[in-house]
């Protein structure tokens, strides 16, 4: 039986040409997660989708189909587009690439959908680096790979800002002396990440490295194209 979904909130993460006049879209939705859909004749001169299939625009989208590739139906605007420019636009592309690489099709991501929309708004108005770090943390949490930020792994004591902790993948953060050991982070930075408070530039730099370290384990050997262009 063909499954039909009517006017689901969505963002387009990616679009690519298909055949002579069509497009294949990667969508982010709250109740169906990542969805791949074929927009037939979307590039035709008289297409009903003309001007509607833009990235970073809140949409209401209908689709049908039983396979992994759905068939796009009606598309309506669901708010004003987020007008990203310059580095903010690159950040938006980075978010989209992360989601395409890490999300499975047809898994609901209600909170992540709202995190994504809030992040687009912050990219228009706010600090780019802090906004990206916050989204990366939220993404890891939603995927079940959130960092253990409540205490150190052995003593089970809360992080202290003036102490240092070595990150051990699959275990957590181990209290240590400040040294040349790899993957050592200040308690100050870990507390900032825990609270999603990124006002200190030195902590922000450490958090960026920690997020990259963690995400790389999920992404595998294939690098993100957008990461090469950012900062």
Swiss-Prot record:
Kindly indicate where the leader peptide sits in this chain: none
Please provide the record's keywords in A-Z order: DNA damage, DNA recombination, DNA repair
Q: Does the keyword Lyase apply?
A: no
Q: Which Gene3D superfamilies match?
A: Nucleic acid-binding proteins (2.40.50.140), Recombination protein O, C-terminal domain (1.20.1440.120)
Which Gene Ontology terms describe the biological processes this protein takes part in?
DNA recombination; double-strand break repair
Q: List the disulfide bonds.
A: none
- Which cellular component appears as one GO term in the record? bacterial nucleoid
Statement: the UniProt record of this protein carries the keyword DNA damage: yes
Q: Sorted alphabetically, which InterPro entries does this protein's record hold?
A: ARFGAP/RecO, DNA_rep/recomb_RecO_N, NA-bd_OB-fold, RecO, RecO_C
Stated role: Involved in DNA repair and RecF pathway recombination.
Q: Which NCBIfam families match?
A: reco (TIGR00613)
Q: Which family does it belong to?
A: Belongs to the RecO family.
Query: Under what name is this protein listed?
Result: DNA repair protein RecO
């Amino acid at each position: 039986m063909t499954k039909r979904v009517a006017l689901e909130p969505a963002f387009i993460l990616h679009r690519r040409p298909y055949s002579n006049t069509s497009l294949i879209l990667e969508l982010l939705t709250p109740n169906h997660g990542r969805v791949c859909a074929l927009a037939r004749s979307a590039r035709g001169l008289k297409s009903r989708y003309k001007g509607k299939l833009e990235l970073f625009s809140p949409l209401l989208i209908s689709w049908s189909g039983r396979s992994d590739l759905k068939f796009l139906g009606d598309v309506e605007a669901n708010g004003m587009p987020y007008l990203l420019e310059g580095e903010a636009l690159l950040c938006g592309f980075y978010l989209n690439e992360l989601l395409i690489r890490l999300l499975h099709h047809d898994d609901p991501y209600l909170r992540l959908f709202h995190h994504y929309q809030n992040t687009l708004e912050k990219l228009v108005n706010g600090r780019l680096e802090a906004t990206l770090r916050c989204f990366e943390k939220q993404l890891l949490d939603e995927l079940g790979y959130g960092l253990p930020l409540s205490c150190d792994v052995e003593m089970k004591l809360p992080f202290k800002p003036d102490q240092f902790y070595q990150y051990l993948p699959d275990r957590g953060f181990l209290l240590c002396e400040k040294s040349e050991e790899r993957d050592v982070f200040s308690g100050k930075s870990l507390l900032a990440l825990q609270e999603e408070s990124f006002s200190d530039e030195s902590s922000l730099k450490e958090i960026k490295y920690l997020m990259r370290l963690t995400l790389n384990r999920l992404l595998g050997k294939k690098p993100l194209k957008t990461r090469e262009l950012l900062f």
